[in-house]
Amino acid sequence: MHCAILKAEAVDGARLMQIFWHDGAESLYPAVWLRDNCQCSDCYLHSAKARKLLLEALDVNIRMDDLTFDQKKVYITWPNGHYSEFEANWLKKRCFSQEARAGLQGELFLPECQYWGSELQLPTLNFEDVLNDDDHAYKWLSSLKKVGIVRLTGAADKRGEIIKLGKRIGFLYLTFYGHTWQVQDKIDANNVAYTTGKLSFHTDYPALHHPPGVQLLHCIKQTVTGGDSEIVDGFNVCQKLKEKNPQAFSILSSTFVDFTDIGVDYCDFSVQSKHKIIELDDKGQVVRINFNNATRDTVFDVPIERVQPFYAALKEFVDLMNSKEYKYTFKMNPGDVITFDNWRLLHGRRSYEAGTEISRHLEGAYADWDVVMSRLRILRQRVMNGN
């Protein structure tokens, strides 16, 4: 972005700065915001990209004492003699117009979301390419954010491969099941995933108040028959539910449900949480699905008259997930790693037969969306700059 200032002036009793740009656009900036964001070394620590100015020292009713400009910068003197400079590009990027704010938020959070159903073309990349090449790593994480799932092929059929992916993004998310965990049938299993039975559509770990955002599953050994993976785009299904039955959508997005998980693994644990099955942001957009029927508690903290309507709404939601139109079925092969958005996708597994030895083995891990998005922003900057 290369912006040129045509004119800058103080308005509204010097409480606002107005800029006229060479491209014909206009921008307004509050004086209090400008003073708060002074970029001088007394007010801003450039080595940490962090504000030093204390809010206690900020006059919220401040006015500009003097304002000058050239094409590239604005120069402001404040009533106490403090002096600030602001670059044109920096100001234009932070314009308060609705269009500019939406554009910057899009750059920061990359909200583009591609909904899908049974027609999904599963994004696929090579495991080693993702580890060793920034362009491929960027494609991996940008597709993960946009589509919600990416398959990586070519990993070794041994434990430890997803630890490499964790290091590629930064670090993995430790839970009560460990840094990584083994999905295989176990005697006296402490999780339904560690059985050979069918797993219905679910998100992992809603028993935590902050469920892991991304899940990584590496296929080390696969059964010959059964064990197919099933996934569904929860955000897409939520949209259809809202269209088909707004009342059911309203119930699931307003009713807090208790989840529990008690046992021993990495250490002993007794976890409780409360979530709405469909979690919305302040604009009414779905931001997370919290649903695991296995760990949904017997405790249900609602008035009795709301119990049956809740079950009816939840059943309709689950029936939609299981319709052929929305679910996608595939089988992992040894060396495959699937990485997916645990806040958006629900996943399941078809049953398989137990043998005298372990016939199916996946290694799993979690990552936090903050860590993934951090790496995605860094990779995006590198790729866009050609570094």
UniProtKB/Swiss-Prot annotation:
Binds 1 Fe(2+) ion per subunit. It catalyses: 4-(trimethylamino)butanoate + 2-oxoglutarate + O2 = carnitine + succinate + CO2. Expressed in the liver and in some extend in the testis and the epididymis. Its cofactor is Fe(2+); L-ascorbate. Its EC number is 1.14.11.1. It is an enzyme of class 1 (oxidoreductase). GO terms for biological process: carnitine biosynthetic process. GO terms for cellular component: cytosol; mitochondrion. PANTHER family: GAMMA-BUTYROBETAINE DIOXYGENASE (PTHR10696:SF33), GAMMA-BUTYROBETAINE HYDROXYLASE-RELATED (PTHR10696). This is Gamma-butyrobetaine dioxygenase.
